[in-house]
UniProtKB/Swiss-Prot annotation:
UniProt-recorded name of the protein: Holliday junction branch migration complex subunit RuvB
Binding site for ATP: 22-23, 64, 67-69, 130-132, 173, 183, 220
Reactions that this protein is recorded to catalyse: ATP + H2O = ADP + phosphate + H(+)
Domain remark in the UniProt entry: Has 3 domains, the large (RuvB-L) and small ATPase (RuvB-S) domains and the C-terminal head (RuvB-H) domain. The head domain binds DNA, while the ATPase domains jointly bind ATP, ADP or are empty depending on the state of the subunit in the translocation cycle. During a single DNA translocation step the structure of each domain remains the same, but their relative positions change.
Organism: Lactobacillus delbrueckii subsp. bulgaricus (strain ATCC 11842 / DSM 20081 / BCRC 10696 / JCM 1002 / NBRC 13953 / NCIMB 11778 / NCTC 12712 / WDCM 00102 / Lb 14)
The keyword Cytoplasm belongs to this UniProt entry's keyword annotation: yes
Amino acid sequence: MTEEHLTSQEAAEGEEAVELSLRPQLLSQYIGQGHVKKDMEVYIQAARQRDEALDHVLLYGPPGLGKTTLAFVIANELGVNLKSTSGPAIERAGDLVALLTDLEPGDVLFIDEIHRLAKPVEEVLYSAMEDFYIDIVVGEGQTTHAIHLPLPPFTLIGATTLAGQLSAPLRDRFGIVEHMQYYQVEDLEKIILRSSEVFHTKISPQAAHELARRSRGTPRVANRLLKRVRDFAEVKGEKEISLETTAMALKQLQVDSAGLDQTDRKLLRTMILSYGGGPVGIRTLASNIGEDRETIESLYEPYLLQNGFIVMTPRGRVVTQKAYQQLNLPLPGEEE
């Protein structure tokens, strides 16, 4: 994995198996997202007491925050099966029909990147979610007719990084909507310590804190950096990952004190040096740094906004004083 992708919140090829090994099974084992956990505990308990399928759930927020993990935990807590797919993988309405008709009562259907469903596929979900049935058109010409297929009550869990791209008819059919937020450093420390046990690796509390501080509020990034720092510690012959080795490794990997990587710094530098700090429109910025608009909006901007490196204005993005300080660049008017 290249250095610029170490802090990407998107799952890299081959990481799914690692994430599966680290995945908690129950809400009591799930670290962070306290507001979401409290809500889901109530909703799950109520559904079980009524012996009903849980209402449909929409999880939205930046990548790497545990939306897929939470979907599996919800299914485990309900004691039902989970079938997992993604928006791009469901190419035709018939693919979705096959998934829906294979569900047992109470099962969970998880659709990642649900905002990327094709419109004809999405429309099949409307009646399935609302009234638990689908109409299938069969035959050709004068023999064309619709078959009404009832479905067992089920729970659809949709995950998206771009909730604003969901159509209103689809969004309105989710009874439970939860916003996954960036993790606090103390929660990331707990995740790193838990992951180190799974990896059979010891790490000092100070090193775990430093790693958590630079992990962009994202468990996926924390676990990825832990694996790389472990490599440096093992080569040095350390039996426990030290703070010194952690700092050295992260410097080598070009992850700075705020968790910014090369692309973050390139984005901020471009705004400052080429556009006087902004405002800058998204299309202009994407073209200048060689990234597509969706990547900037879903991977980079949320963290930069959350941590006060940029602000949004009606005319575009503007860097803050904090960004100048992080990059060691003079503020406007202070240039020599």
